[in-house]
Amino acid sequence: MAVPKKRTSISKKHIRRNFWKRKGYWAAVKAFSLAKSISTGYSKGFFVRQKK
């Protein structure tokens, strides 16, 4: 089993965590943008059934 030789510095830990959080933030922004375009009807990549 692999074991780290030295302790990871706090700054490196913060950098990695911030990078991870930023990825989640951009995924949420994209999802919200897609939901907005579908709800307004401006989406060109989807076919949404309209209720009659």
Curated annotation (Swiss-Prot):
Pfam families from the UniProt entry: Ribosomal_L32p
Gene Ontology CC: chloroplast; large ribosomal subunit
Localization of this protein: Plastid, Chloroplast
Key words of the record: Chloroplast, Plastid, Ribonucleoprotein, Ribosomal protein
Record flagged with keyword Chloroplast: yes
Record has Ribonucleoprotein as a keyword: yes
GO BP field: translation
Disulfide bond entries: none
Chief localization: plastid
GO molecular function annotations of the record: structural constituent of ribosome
Family according to the record: Belongs to the bacterial ribosomal protein bL32 family.
Protein's name according to its UniProt entry: Large ribosomal subunit protein bL32c
